[in-house]
Amino acid sequence: MAHGPGALMLKCVVVGDGAVGKTCLLMSYANDAFPEEYVPTVFDHYAVSVTVGGKQYLLGLYDTAGQEDYDRLRPLSYPMTDVFLICFSVVNPASFQNVKEEWVPELKEYAPNVPFLLIGTQIDLRDDPKTLARLNDMKEKPICVEQGQKLAKEIGACCYVECSALTQKGLKTVFDEAIIAILTPKKHTVKKRIGSRCINCCLIT
């Protein structure tokens, strides 16, 4: 947690397999709109002004590339991180499996004491006929909420949150919970919810 001009900077880094919607997640939240046209492989760093309990913070949002080609470069963005979001797509079972096999071990190696949340993305595709047909052809099905909650508990995540960058359902909750994970003592993080806290955000350009 670093000091900014008049506000504390909170650093949030998003990790996970490629093509699970990490960049769209960040762009939809930062711009309050789903990117309809070109979506870059990696999202530019944005700072969002966040007010929590009357105090102002700058939430820095950092994207990462999930492909193996970036395995050596990706950890360079990890120092000074306050919270990680480990993302998987609820319609990509392989990305769900890789949370435990790839992403948790990587964070344990490079940032063992930093809190992290488990995020299920692309929930708008859970009932999409074409997506379901594709999964059925592979003898697979979407990841359900209970599976996400169970994995979050197994890996020691602060919580499990599902969202859709397209519809923005659950999107604000993702970042509200990320902020709470940073500002709440570790032993209380899992059970602590938004409660009466007022969290207001605006994009800093």
Swiss-Prot record:
Which Pfam families does this entry report, sorted A to Z? Ras
PROSITE patterns from the entry?
RHO
The protein's topology relative to the membrane is: Lipid-anchor
Highest taxon of the lineage: Eukaryota
Residues with S-farnesyl cysteine lipidation? 202
Q: Which key words are in the record? A: Cell membrane, Cytoplasm, GTP-binding, Lipoprotein, Membrane, Methylation, Nucleotide-binding, Prenylation
> InterPro entries, from UniProt?
P-loop_NTPase, Small_GTP-bd, Small_GTPase, Small_GTPase_Rho
List the ranges annotated as motif Effector region.
Answer: 38-46
Q: Which residues are propeptide?
A: 203-205
The protein's location, in the record's own words, is:
Cytoplasm; Cell membrane
The record describes its post-translational modification as: May be post-translationally modified by both palmitoylation and polyisoprenylation.
User: Annotated Gene Ontology MF terms?
Assistant: GBD domain binding; GTP binding; GTPase activity; profilin binding; protein kinase binding
Kindly list the positions at which Cysteine methyl ester occurs in this protein.
Answer: 202
Which residues of the sequence carry a binding annotation for GTP?
A: 16-23, 63-67, 121-124
The GO biological-process annotations, alphabetized, read as: actin filament organization; cellular response to insulin stimulus; cortical actin cytoskeleton organization; endocytosis; establishment of cell polarity; GTP metabolic process; insulin receptor signaling pathway; negative regulation of protein localization to plasma membrane
A single GO CC term for this protein reads: extracellular exosome
Activity regulation reads: Regulated by guanine nucleotide exchange factors (GEFs) which promote the exchange of bound GDP for free GTP, GTPase activating proteins (GAPs) which increase the GTP hydrolysis activity, and GDP dissociation inhibitors which inhibit the dissociation of the nucleotide from the GTPase.
Main function: Plasma membrane-associated small GTPase which cycles between an active GTP-bound and an inactive GDP-bound state. In active state binds to a variety of effector proteins to regulate cellular responses. Involved in epithelial cell polarization processes. May play a role in CFTR trafficking to the plasma membrane. Causes the formation of thin, actin-rich surface projections called filopodia.
Similarity remark: Belongs to the small GTPase superfamily. Rho family.
Q: How does it assemble?
A: Interacts with CDC42EP4 in a GTP-dependent manner. Interacts with ARHGAP33/TCGAP. Interacts with CDC42EP1, CDC42EP2, CDC42EP3, PARD6A, PARD6G (and probably PARD6B) in a GTP-dependent manner. Part of a quaternary complex containing PARD3, some PARD6 protein (PARD6A, PARD6B or PARD6G) and some atypical PKC protein (PRKCI or PRKCZ). Interacts with EXO70 in a GTP-dependent manner. Interacts with GOPC.
Protein name (database record): Rho-related GTP-binding protein RhoQ
